[in-house]
Amino acid sequence: MIIPSYIKERKQPMKQIFNPYLPSYEYIPDGEPHIFNNRLYIYGSHDRFNGTTYCENDYVCWSAPVDDLSDWRFEGEIYNRKQHPHKEECLILFAPDVIQGSDGRYYLYYSVAHSSRMSVAVCDSPAGHFEYLGDVKTKDGRVYGIQSGDYVQFDPGVFMDDDGSVYLYSGFCPKKTEDEHGRIMEGAFVCRLMPDMLTMYELPHIIIPRNWTCPDNAGFFEASSMRKINGIYYFIYSARINGLHYATSRYPDRDFVYGGRIHSSSDIGLRGYTIDNAAYPNGNTHGSIIAVNNHYYIFDHRFSNNTSFCRQGVAERINIEKNGHISQVEATSCGLNNGPLSAEGTYPSYIACHIRNLTITSDMPKEDRLKLMPYITQDGEDRDYGDDQYIKNMQNGCMVGYKYFNFNNNIDINNNANILTTDYVNNSINSNNSN
């Protein structure tokens, strides 16, 4: 086993942490990490276990001290869908983002499903109870995004530059170029906001078009997020179901050049894994980068429960080279642990980072593939307690993998490893000790 150099060290003793980094009953995808007052806050949408669509729960928040990313605290509900004042076709809160304004208050940007309206809520603290403020609008007071000819408003990413300028990014680029209301879906776009955090200085303009120069299957799809690192602007985005990618520029609003893939929770792009032959069940993706104690991390999500609607947050440490390049990081079980997990101890099965059935082929109907695939799930209904997920549907041809563990103390896995199973496992499980 080859352990990447960036996860070999452990700077200080602390409780171990796994992927997913939140309790297994918590389904928070689309995570935007931000540091306020020496705490790392995660703002994301909120899936419901056994839900029938994306983001069925209200916004909640978790945070951890920057000096111990294993010590996550539940901050509670920060915004309820019933606070949204408009009647919508589907009152579902899609992926949000948060920024601290120049006035010291915290602004939450969000879009209700299919509304194409970017709304804003405000709070005096980073994880208090946000109150609806208004909708993003043009100088003449018109709410932008709801008329034919507007760009579709979706997945806000909000960013404050060093000079205090605030930029709002959005965009959606499926196969069709406009929705049923004539609103345009042609790529990622940006506008600059006035100090009221609602009014645009100018109409949005495209920064990454549909026909952008990039490798196959790496074009912009959704999930806009902006970061500035060492003078370089990094636009992080999702390229459909093959991971989080990035583009760079010397400007926040133009001239972006494709950089590469940062992370795929299915390891697509590494070791020969592809969309049709992934290391873990794949689907959409959304997240961003944060610097904590001189290390950089990518926050993303993975899938569970054999569905697209039970997503969980995962994170990995990344390396940004002197020239600004980010190499793709693999999906692991240890994530924020900043090093391999101890080979001594008991670990829950749900921290698996590879789940496959080697008998599945790409030409199989989706329904047949789902029947054969093992998956991570839980018993009971959606809840806020009970860290008891497990792997279900293990059968002949299935493989589950975990990375990484520290065997430096001459631990012999043949003599010391036990696999504790549930009633859901039939027949026997063989473990393979390989390097």
Go through each PLM region and give its residues:
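Carbohydrate-active catalytic/glycan-binding domains of CAZyme proteins
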Residues: 2-425, 430
